[in-house]
């Protein structure tokens, strides 16, 4: 117990004092400055090594003392890391410059388009006879010439379409007339055929009148009469007209 109390009394003042804050400024004493440089340099190199191992980072550390002596550390290569740094800085600067250039270009193009839209709107109003107060005599004459030229083109196009429509209607009329003549001819031909058929039916020798005028043939009883053809003689003998033989 006495040993622990004595140890506590010895350690407690150190805990109370702790490590004081060091003012960050140039050390005037050359010896102290050199000693501090060596300590801090070794600690910095150690931290760089730990960072590269623990975090798998590419680290390059370059330190020059006040006497010009070089101290360096790199887990890969100082030169390769510096080249990579230069390339990254160049890419970022180029990206920024390209973005700025694009923004300026689009702004200029937008301004040009707005100006063109404004001019076209003014010209449209002038063509409609509006916003003529600020125009000079020469501008009004030019506007009049443009309007007359436009009207001439419009009339020419209108007449072209009108003539094409008239030509189409004339052609359509001819086609309808031809179709009408063809139908009339077919109707007349049909009427003539019907009239001829009616006349043939009314003639005495027509088949219909023949059936009406000629009585039907007489019916014979086959039990009492024989056909003449069955009793006809041969062609080598003279033919004799005989009445049909009646069987009793």
Swiss-Prot record:
SMART domains: MADS. This is Floral homeotic protein AGAMOUS. Probable transcription factor involved in regulating genes that determines stamen and carpel development in wild-type flowers. PANTHER family: SERUM RESPONSE FACTOR HOMOLOG (PTHR48019). It is found in: Nucleus. GO terms for biological process: positive regulation of transcription by RNA polymerase II; regulation of transcription by RNA polymerase II. Residues 103-193 form the K-box domain. SUPFAM superfamilies: SRF-like. Keywords: Activator, DNA-binding, Nucleus, Transcription, Transcription regulation. The keyword Transferase does not apply. It comes from the Eukaryota. Disulfide bonds: none annotated. It comes from Solanum lycopersicum. One of its GO terms (molecular function) is RNA polymerase II cis-regulatory region sequence-specific DNA binding. Its main location: nucleus. GO terms for cellular component: nucleus. Residues 19-73 form the MADS-box domain. The keyword Nucleotide-binding does not apply.
